[in-house]
Amino acid sequence: MKQILIAVLLSFPLIVSAEDEEQKDSLKVIHLDEVNVYSYKETMLQQMPVSSTTLTPNTINGAQLNSIRDLSVFVPNLFIPDYGSAMSTVPYIRGVGSRSSGQSMALYVDNVPYFEKSTFDFDFYDIRQIEILRGPQGTLYGRNALGGIVNIYTLSPFDFQGTKFSVTGGNYGLAKVQASYYDKINAHLGWSVSGYYNHVDGFFTNLYNHKKADNKTSAGGRAKIEWLVTPNFRTQYIFNYDYVDQRAYPYGLYDPSTGTTALPNYNDDNSYGRSMVNNSLLLEYTTDKIQLTSSTSHQYFSDDMKMDQDFSPKSYFSLNQRQKQQALNEEIAIRSKTTSNYQWSFGLTTFLQYLDTDAPVAFKKDGITDILQPVFDRAAAMGAPIMTITDTVMNIPGNFNTTTWGGALFHQSTYNHLLVDGLSVTAGLRADFEKTKLDYSTHSKLNLNMKMGPRTIPLSIADTLQGKESLQFSEILPKVALKYAWDDRQFAYVTVSKGYKTGGFNIQMFSDLMQTQLMNSGNPAATKINVADAIAYQPEHSMNYEIGYQSAFFNHRLKTHLSLFYMDISDMQLTKFVPSGNGRMITNAGEVTSKGMEVSLQTNLGKGFGLDVNYGYAHAVFENYTDSVKVGNTVEEVDYKGNFVPYAPQNTLCLNGTYTHLFNNAFIDHITANVQYMGTGKIYWDEANSLSQQFYHTVNAKVGLVKNNFELEIWGKNLLNTNYNTFYFESFGNRFFQKGKPLQCGVTLKVEL
């Protein structure tokens, strides 16, 4: 029945078109919107030898792309699972991604880099264009652009003047308000202010306290000033604030015997809160020969994450992590603006990031009784004195200060019409350097009673881990591309490029290290902990080979983009729970290959109809990866060669149908309709490939009625109420999933004056 419904929904535009062959095509451009250049690094993406997707305001609004997570699957081979909290935004692109290490996809908003995945999830409003570049973009963008980049550009007061207001209501207590004002004082000066408020009651109930486990409130605002100082010189200043407060991590226990996932059921607080402030200044000087740009930005965020790390009604242990970041970034770039065959660009970038993390872990009553006390009981069974823990809570405070500095020089040259008309070659090189330092301090104390014969002696064991570690990395990131254009409508290309994701320190390991050190206290035979080896992880590298074809026919009513890619990834960073269960470690997983294809079709069918087809296939497997796995009381070596990389889907499919109809002398001016079919899977949840999410599909839709300056939208998400999982992990031998959000629906009223 679901398949039949999907077929009907997707064939709707063609059915209506067949019935209305005589209707006048009154919309000349309703689907393939104009794409503009806002990046100072790139020219028109549609003319570049790269796999890319550009989303305009009509598409962003019609497809209900309200945050970066909504880009998932809409773009070929891009998957951003919606789970956890605003902190846990993990992009997977072409089979590449990581839950806890640095991002594999870089994010820029108005040319400002976002350094931490903790800041990726925020509400979209007044967005004028989104660009997604797939494949390593290290030459121009450097670190952490191993899988690709996302560029987001907000609306300019030179593009729109007036007031925008919208209010939304929906099921599950959804309430959203957005308002903005744009003004152009004169031909040279414009300014704008905008803001939003968004609340949802939540979708899942915590069985322990019968409260919603994932209610969320977010709010924010933006101010922008743009000044054309002279015809050649312009400046832009942007201030942006975002706030989020939510219940989080609605993970439910998985029952392998029935294949079902229970509702969340935990006793400790699971929540996340974040405040983020961005300031940026763009200076741009342009002549008929060059464009010189300076981009200066500062990002501050402060967050507070509370997590019941056993996710059960018992009191095992909990984490309260608070972060504060100060990040400065400066980039100066110059590129040619002539019409000659030779085009070039040079750039210099540097950044400084301070990240202070306070992450105390609390071992609670059940954790002490069921985990720590048995360690002493086993020792007593072998003849050691009988030890009884008297604490009901053991706190392990942790303070970590991370300072990272980096810099890079880059160059890219393109020579067009090389030897023959239509043949061009692009070559680029980037020298990237980075140094990171970690100051850490953590300690713990455990009170016990030691029984020796008839005597009971109270005693305490305590230990401290305190010190400094540093890492530094340097990389050379080359790129070569060859392109041949038959005419201005079609071209083919071959690209070879290198990608790089930086290494770093995994501070989540310290609770496990501290517990081990405490248990070994007083044992001279115990192996001394090597902190540097335990917490450091190395960079991840990739070589990407790609062949592609792009075309635009029928007056740009049909656009195609086909690509085949092969990625050879070394030292892939993967996240694993340590054998004790009370910490996560990042390992470099040997070698991985990811190969696949991407197909994008954009069509303007006429009569107001449009259809996009976006398909991605990624076959990402381990070529060389062995790991130590604890089985009972023994540790075994397991070879994962040939297994699929977990968490990344093998297939993504999006069919996006649009329809717009104008009315003459009617109560409404025009009607719009949008339908999206989204298919995702198969996804393996662990390196052993023992659990998986089969291919699943969801359907979204929106209908809009427009009269003068007013628009009424009726919308729905996951209209088939598909039951699927978005995230999986293990803790203390238990398996947990987070389910996908159920059917959502609502109404939005928009006013534009």
Where are the predicted features?
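Extracytoplasmic beta-strand/coil segments of soluble accessory domains associated
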Residues: 69-110
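Short acidic/polar hinge/loop motifs at secondary-structure boundaries
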Residues: 110-136
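Transmembrane beta-barrel wall of Gram-negative outer-membrane proteins
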Residues: 162-164, 169-200, 204, 208-246, ...
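N-terminal periplasmic accessory domains that precede
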Residues: 68-71, 90-95, 108, 132, ...
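Gram-negative outer-membrane beta-barrel transporters
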Residues: 335, 339, 345, 351, ...
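Membrane-embedded beta-barrel scaffold of Gram-negative outer-membrane proteins
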Residues: 282-307, 491-497, 508, 514-588, ...
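C-terminal beta-signal and adjacent terminal beta-strands/loops
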Residues: 345, 500, 608-611, 666, ...
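Short, acidic, small-residue-rich periplasmic hinge/interaction motif at the N-terminus
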Residues: 19-61
